[in-house]
């Protein structure tokens, strides 16, 4: 399931009295939102201001919860809420929900049972390392034993979620490489840049051995939750550089030589 494009299912849409579909531009990424009747929005062209007032805190709360349950990131929900007057208490409520979700016990790692946010931070690391779902399952899968059913179920759910992240990332990468490669592969220095342009920069970085942390600081201007980072439009570029850097390091590493068997061993 693709998180960044996920739109509320028909059964959830029915919870809204009247639905008006609008498009909110997030640095070139078109994200489709739904709003309940009672909210008014002034729409403008590129570069124009948009303002809005919510009919009630209740309707805005319903929308925020709807987006939260639809796996939209906290940054996207915040941008939506900030278009409406009286959004502060709703924003505080949603922030609390994100904190509670991030604190849920989610997965067993080397250090034991960890929270969702800790596990998702690990998801980011695995993606940058190029780990497949199969590799993660081999490393962190829990064997089924009597009395161990709940742990197995929890672990399988987390590993499946990692697989969903990979599936989503592959879809986004394909879209950028095949539909927006010429103009909007990433957002840097206040503008969208092409895939060819950024690959040229990445090639120079990889040749110089520029650390991944430097690329991260260029692509993401502020700290954010792992899930929010994953949904950022620059994440595909981040993963692209990580892959280029891995390949460069591999190409200059001396070949592995197994020890020559001797009589003593």
UniProtKB/Swiss-Prot annotation:
A motif (RxLR-dEER) lies at residues 32-50. Its main location: secreted. One of its GO terms (cellular component) is host cell cytoplasm. Keywords: Glycoprotein, Host cytoplasm, Host nucleus, Secreted, Signal, Virulence. Glycans are attached at residues 71, 148. It is found in: Secreted; Host nucleus; Host cytoplasm. Coiled coil: none annotated. The keyword Transmembrane helix does not apply. Residues 1-25 form the signal peptide. Belongs to the RxLR effector family. Secreted effector that completely suppresses the host cell death induced by cell death-inducing proteins. The RxLR-dEER motif acts to carry the protein into the host cell cytoplasm through binding to cell surface phosphatidylinositol-3-phosphate. This is Secreted RxLR effector protein 146.
């Amino acid at each position: 399931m693709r998180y960044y494009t996920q739109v509320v299912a028909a059964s959830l849409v029915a919870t809204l009295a009247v639905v008006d579909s609008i498009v909110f531009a997030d640095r070139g990424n078109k994200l489709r939102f739904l709003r309940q009747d009672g909210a008014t929005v002034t729409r403008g062209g590129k570069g124009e201001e948009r303002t809005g007032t919510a009919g009630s805190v209740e309707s805005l709360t319903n929308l925020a919860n709807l987006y939260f349950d639809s796996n939209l990131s906290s940054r996207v929900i915040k941008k939506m809420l900030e278009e409406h007057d009286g959004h502060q208490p709703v924003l505080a409520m949603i922030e609390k929900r994100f904190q509670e979700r991030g604190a849920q016990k989610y997965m067993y790692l080397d250090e034991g049972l960890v929270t969702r946010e800790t596990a998702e931070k690990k998801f980011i690391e695995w993606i940058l390392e190029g780990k497949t779902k199969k590799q993660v399952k081999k490393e962190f899968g829990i064997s089924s034993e009597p009395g161990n059913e709940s742990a197995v179920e929890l672990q399988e759910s987390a590993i499946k979620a990692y697989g969903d992240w990979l599936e989503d990332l592959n879809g986004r990468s394909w879209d950028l490489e095949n539909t927006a490669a010429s103009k909007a592969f990433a957002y840097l220095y206040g503008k969208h840049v092409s895939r060819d342009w950024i690959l040229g920069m990445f090639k120079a970085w990889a040749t110089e051995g520029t650390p991944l942390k430097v690329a991260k600081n260029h692509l993401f201007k502020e700290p954010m939750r792992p899930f929010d980072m994953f949904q950022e439009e620059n994440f595909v570029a981040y993963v692209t550089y990580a892959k280029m850097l891995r390949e460069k390091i591999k190409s200059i590493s001396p070949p592995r030589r197994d020890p020559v068997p001797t009589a003593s061993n």
